[in-house]
Amino acid sequence: MMKKLLLLLICLATVIISGCGDKFAKEKEAISKAEKTAMSMEVPVLVKPDPSQQPPPAKEDYTRYQAGLNKLIAAENKMLVEMRKSDAQIATLLGKAEKEEEKKDLRQFRDKVRQDRISFVKKISQGRLSGDTFIVGVGSTWQEVEMVYGKPESTGNQFPGTKQYVYKGLKFEDIIGGGVPSPERLKKWVSRTVQSVTMTGKNVTSDAGVTIGMTRDQVYKVLKAKYVKKNSRLTTNELKAERTNKSDGFDAVTQFAMEETAPYNLFLEFKKGKLFRYIVAQN
């Protein structure tokens, strides 16, 4: 009897010391369930046609891709509604948290939610991205960018025919193509995917391993390590680059691809021999 009473007192003391368990357990469980439900929605598996391949993709390949992209974006819009709710709920819980331990636990929970989203986006992005990437990149939908990085800090200085999502150290962008667009075409234009990414912050590392502040030799070392020749028109397996070798200047790497991505161009701006701006863009 005394042994049972002692065990009961020990358990009671443990509960008191630990603050009676997780204060926000129910809320976190509900958020996790909503996130899981959102990411279990059916999405089409897309493979973006690669014009550098031989023979080049047929018109039907592009038509099929565009139709699938429409379905994907529709599903992702529904997911984002739930994810934005989750973000708002987590922010509310952080505002209610009184103890530092509670805040720390909620931040860890928020990071776990983001990591789950990143894993999901990586899975559904396979076969659609080009060049160097930043988890998301050229070929990603705007919805996927927000899933990974959250709502943009700003949308840049947009004008008709452009779209930008700006984050600390990163800018995702799309610009209408096909020459000078007519007013009618500008009015109807809707951006669906990212076409270029610019990295300027030291807080970011590309998936190839490039960071701002690297020397020219460091940049090319990591790019060569990740480069995979995928353009059948290229006659060599070597990384194709136009280097200025000037302390201040631009370099261009053409048809850069990794194991997971299709060929795309890279533009490197150096100042005082260090990488200052890194752009993934078609031209």
Predicted regions and their residues:
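Generic N-terminal leader/processing signal
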Residues: 1-2, 21, 26, 97, ...
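Sec-dependent signal peptide recognition
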Residues: 3-9
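Repetitive helical segments and hydrophobic/amphipathic motifs
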Residues: 12-13
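Short helix/turn-capping signatures at newly exposed starts of structured segments
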Residues: 20-29, 33-38, 46, 74, ...
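Amphipathic, non-membrane alpha-helical rod segments
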Residues: 43-101
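Repeat-blade elements of multi-bladed beta-propeller folds
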Residues: 247-254
